[in-house]
Design a protein with these regions (language model features):
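Low-acidity, Ser/Thr- and Arg-rich intrinsically disordered low-complexity segments
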Residues: 1-5, 12-13
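Basic polycationic patches enriched in arginine
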Residues: 2-3, 26, 31-34
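Short alpha-helix boundary/capping segments
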Residues: 13-15, 136
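Nucleotide and nucleotide-moiety/phosphate-recognizing core
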Residues: 29, 38-139, 148-149
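Flexible, gly/pro- and Lys/Arg-enriched active-site loops
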Residues: 90-101, 111-117, 121-217
Length: 217
């Protein structure tokens, strides 16, 4: 470590004695950018990640709810949409009710996985999501499928999403969108043939309502 010299004067009855003592210098304080730094400079310096978000819903005007959710996601600090898949229609998963609409969005963000997930949950709540019982009909479901190459296994968040590979309504739009974003980071997906077979087995099919393509990012 760097050192500096400090002169210490010691008084004595006979004479003044000057003693030089070397003490370590404190290292300079280096502040790294934080995600909470929402200034243009702070956001530009923060590392960016591609987050993949699955959207689902079967209550109300689902396409309109999706559009609002995408706008809210894009409004998060240091976040913008990279692309959105077509809409897919799916039979309710392990439940009864109206057909689901599903899509997948790719998002570039500086937010860490946990912070990004909490933001998604807040958007769900603002747009009327309720959880009366498992697999209940819903206005909006936002699932974080992957966040860069992050891996997580906590009660709050598992990455990559542990059940995405089982769900045609996730895999079909995810594969479609990822083909348009070849440089984006994502986990390995099943083959096209395997996804098509899963779509047939689970009743997932393309079904974009009028106006959805106009709202596509």
């Amino acid at each position: 470590p760097r050192r500096e010299s400090v002169a210490v004067v010691v008084a004595s009855p006979a004479a003044k004695v000057v003693v030089t003592v070397e003490v370590p210098m404190r290292p300079p304080v280096v502040r790294t950018p934080r995600v909470t730094d929402t200034s243009a400079q702070g956001l530009s310096l923060a590392p960016r990640f591609t987050a993949w978000v699955a959207l689902g819903g079967n209550l109300g005007d689902v396409a309109a709810t999706f559009r609002q959710a995408l706008a809210d996601i894009a409004a998060l600090p240091g976040t913008h949409l990279q692309g959105v898949s077509a809409l897919y229609e799916t039979e309710p998963w392990q439940a009864q009710g109206p057909l689901f609409l599903n899509a997948v969005a790719a998002v570039s963000t500086v937010l860490a996985p946990g912070e990004f997930l909490r933001s998604l949950l807040a958007i769900e709540a603002r747009l009327g999501r309720e959880r009366p019982y498992p697999n209940a009909p819903r206005t909006l479901d936002l699932d974080l499928l992957a966040h860069g190459d992050a891996q997580s296994a906590t009660p709050e968040l598992t990455l990559p999403h542990p059940r995405a590979q089982e769900r045609a309504f996730v895999l079909a739009p995810w594969a479609e969108l990822s083909a348009r974003l070849p440089d984006a980071t994502l986990p390995p997906l099943p083959s096209r043939e395997a996804i098509e077979a899963l779509c047939q087995a689970q009743g997932a099919r393309p079904g974009a309502p009028a106006g959805w393509e106009i709202a596509r990012a």
